[in-house]
């Protein structure tokens, strides 16, 4: 029948749009994609507010097992796939849309606020941002060259760089602003390129889109010791 991919916004169960809520209530099956981001409320709170059981969909279910789960249900049921932020903010969701269309499943998209719009709370002008990059959980086996390359390219055009920090919600693991700065400093030292140093001006954010966000600016060395509170950062 149909697959509705519904953005939930960034904070809690009440950030869903009216249209999105109507679609959730009309759905036969409701999934929540739970690995690209996280809401700041519990699953049972969502279920109570929506009046529906919510199936937590991890990476395996959405990507490698979608044919057996989400898309299989959508062949003859109304399925809602809930996504924190905006539905089209990750390539994962674009992939499942393509696969659904290949199966002639009707697709409906309900947008919502995402980090790409909420970053405006920093006071930085959105049109002055360049390419975005992600910082993965750092280890000696995983060099983080891409973020530094993006920062370098954006500097040449005098553009800001939005860096998205890694997270692993099923295992309650979230990268902090402090860890991200440390990873960038270490990588830049390793490369000996000076792209990101202790004096680099940064803006660190946590819990954007909620009632108590933390936004702090300063040099990398200063922010590396600041407390940004609970995730997500």
Residue ranges and their predicted role:
Residues 85-161:
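Class I SAM-dependent methyltransferase SAM-binding "motif I" and its flanking Rossmann-like core
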